Structures are given as structure tokens and as C-alpha cells.
């Protein structure tokens, strides 16, 4: 059975890697952020289409069984500007809907931040879901936490999955796995990383483990407003797209609360406080060590890793979709 799919807002390709592991074949990828192009092409072996999604013509996209993608989430996030579809980045979601309508794949998957189903954005989110229903899809959505699917990270995201109506299928989200993966499991064997060079430039190939370097610099008052350390036997905090907000490595003690929204580093900590390295973040997101991230400034490395869908979670969703499709098409 043909398992060719198209990827949008591809980034480094965490969603793509998970779907590939489940037996799908990425034949088209699109992202207009140049910071991810080399990383995607080197690791996935296909050329990326570099246009903004609004400029894409349906004729440029091959016929595929499915569409996958996570439209930019800053416009829907609780930490961001909360302007939703009024933000140009929010409008890209509707460009995705239009392409699904034109190409009519058997299924689509979209991922976004949980802020999209917050009270502020819920009416807009329901309009978005209805726009998929109106073009002939049975749509299901759910907030999933990656830690329930073998990912060593607290990370809640909304997943929307639609099956074309003529398949008579309803997507049921996979049940959580009875398997907790900890920070120790994910990063405990890594050697000491290197700090980034001046102005957070990358060490490039002068690293024992690729991308095993961390952002230096001060910690903002926002960063110090809560504890940023999880212990070895816990899962990580959410890996964010900004290196400045990368969690601290578990070698240090948990931070101490000294007032409302004010924490300090424990002066008694046996080891220093530092941000997780790009490779540590990548491991937490499920990328193997032979998946190399290419960047000149470590900030771009953190952005690629933090924007990705955790590979293991993507794979679990993909396996369920593949099983459903095989059930009706074979």
C-alpha cells in the first residue's frame, strides 16, 4: 500500500521522523524558515520546498495519502501574544486547510499548543475544526502529554486528526504507554558538554558528541520566576523553542523559592547550574545522536529542537493511523 505523505511547517522534522519510523514515506516537505533547511535536507534526504505555505500551488504537491504539520504556534500560545487567527502566523493554519481541501488526502494531522483550546481561542479553534469538517473530514482532537508516550518530558500539545469521510473511520487516540522514561534514561550517559563560543556561536565540529553545547549568558527575571531544575528520576520540563528558556541540567539542586515568582540558585548545590545542551534537548525530544542539527548560532539549534514534535509521540500516532488505513484499504 502506498504510504507517501506530505509534510508542512516541517522544521527539523520530528513529526516526519516519527512517521518514517512507523512506515510512512515523506515525499514532499515545506518550510519557509531558512534556519531549518540544511538540517531537514541532510537528515531526511529530500529537498525542502522553501515557499511560504500561502504561496504554494496544489499542483506543486504530489498526490499523497496524508498531510502532516504543526502550523506556527506563537500566535495561539498562552505565553505569546494570544492573537490567534488575526496574527499572520495564525492565518497559515487556514492555508493548510485550503491545501487539504484541494489535494483531498485520506488523512491529515495538525499539531499545536494547548493555548489554542484555551477560553480565549476556543471559538476560533472550533471554527478551524469545522473548516476541516466542511471539506469532508471526520475530525477528532485531543490534548496529549508526551510523557504518557515514552517521552522523558512534560509537554502538552493539541493534536487534530481527520479521516476523509468516505473511509467511514473515526480516529481514536492511542492509549498511554505504561512506560515512564526519565532524564537519567535519556541523557545520563552523555559526557560534559562545551559552552557555546562568544555571542553563542556554535563550536561546530569541535564537539565530542554532535550539538552537545549549551547557551551561556544571564538568566532573566522571568526565568528566575520558577524552579527550572528537574531531578534525574523525573521527566524534563517542556523543551521550548528558545535557548534562553532551556531547563537547567539535573546535576544541580532544585532552585529555592524566596518570594512570589522569585527563585534563586541554591548556593549549596554540589554542581553548577547550566542550561541543557542542544543535544540533551534533542535526546529528550527523541532525536537519535546521528540526527545532526546544523546552525551557526546555538539559538537556532534550540529553536529547531524545541519546535519539533517529540519523535516517539509522532511515531505512536503514525502507527495508529497506519493501522486504521490498512484496515480499510487492504
Curated annotation (Swiss-Prot):
What are the recorded Gene Ontology BP terms? DNA restriction-modification system; methylation; negative regulation of gene expression via chromosomal CpG island methylation
In the record, which residues are listed under signal peptide? none
Q: From the UniProt record, list the reaction(s) this protein catalyses.
A: a 2'-deoxycytidine in DNA + S-adenosyl-L-methionine = a 5-methyl-2'-deoxycytidine in DNA + S-adenosyl-L-homocysteine + H(+)
Which residues carry out catalysis? 73
Give the family, as the similarity comment puts it.
Belongs to the class I-like SAM-binding methyltransferase superfamily. C5-methyltransferase family.
Gene Ontology MF term list: DNA (cytosine-5-)-methyltransferase activity; DNA binding
Q: Which residues form a coiled coil?
A: none
Tell me the organism: Methanothermobacter thermautotrophicus (Methanobacterium thermoformicicum)
> What's this protein's name?
Type II methyltransferase M.MthTI
Q: What is its EC number?
A: 2.1.1.37
Per UniProt, what is one Pfam family of this protein? DNA_methylase
Amino acid at each position: 500500500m502506498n504510504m507517501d505523505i506530505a509534510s508542512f511547517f516541517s522544521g527539523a522534522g520530528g513529526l516526519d521522523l516519527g512517521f518514517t519510523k512507523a512506515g510512512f514515506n515523506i515525499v514532499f516537505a515545506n518550510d519557509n524558515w531558512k534556519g531549518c533547511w540544511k538540517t531537514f535536507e541532510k537528515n531526511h534526504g529530500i529537498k525542502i520546498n522553501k515557499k511560504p505555505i500561502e504561496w504554494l500551488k496544489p499542483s506543486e504537491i504530489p498526490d499523497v495519502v496524508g498531510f502532516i504539520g504543526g502550523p506556527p504556534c506563537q500566535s495561539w500560545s498562552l505565553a505569546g501574544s494570544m492573537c490567534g487567527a488575526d496574527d499572520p502566523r495564525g492565518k497559515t493554519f487556514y492555508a493548510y486547510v485550503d491545501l487539504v481541501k484541494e489535494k483531498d488526502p485520506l488523512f491529515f494531522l495538525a499539531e499545536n499548543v494547548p493555548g489554542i483550546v484555551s477560553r480565549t481561542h476556543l471559538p476560533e479553534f472550533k471554527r478551524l475544526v469545522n473548516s476541516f469538517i466542511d471539506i469532508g473530514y471526520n475530525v477528532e482532537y485531543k490534548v496529549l502529554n508526551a510523557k504518557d508516550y515514552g517521552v522523558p518530558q512534560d509537554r502538552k500539545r493539541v493534536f487534530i486528526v481527520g479521516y476523509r469521510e468516505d473511509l467511514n473511520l473515526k480516529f481514536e487516540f492511542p492509549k498511554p504507554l505504561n512506560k515512564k522514561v526519565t532524564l537519567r534514561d535519556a541523557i545520563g550517559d552523555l559526557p560534559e558538554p562545551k559552552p557555546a563560543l562568544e555571542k553563542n556561536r556554535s563550536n561546530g565540529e569541535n564537539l565530542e558528541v554532535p550539538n552537545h553545547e549549551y547557551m551561556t549568558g544571564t538568566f532573566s527575571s522571568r526565568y528566575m520566576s520558577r524552579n527550572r531544575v528537574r531531578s534525574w528520576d523525573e521527566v524534563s520540563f517542556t523543551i521550548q523553542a528558545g535557548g534562553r528558556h532551556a531547563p537547567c541540567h539535573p546535576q544541580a539542586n532544585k532552585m529555592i523559592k524566596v518570594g512570589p515568582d522569585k527563585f534563586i540558585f541554591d548556593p549549596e548545590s554540589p554542581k553548577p547550574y547550566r542550561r541543557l545542551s542542544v543535544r540533551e534537548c534533542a535526546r529528550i525530544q527523541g532525536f537519535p545522536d546521528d540526527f545532526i542539527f546544523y546552525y551557526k548560532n546555538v539559538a537556532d539549534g534550540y529553536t529547531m529542537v524545541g519546535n519539533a514534535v517529540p519523535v516517539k509521540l509522532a511515531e505512536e500516532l503514525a502507527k495508529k493511523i497506519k493501522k486504521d488505513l490498512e484496515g480499510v484499504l487492504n
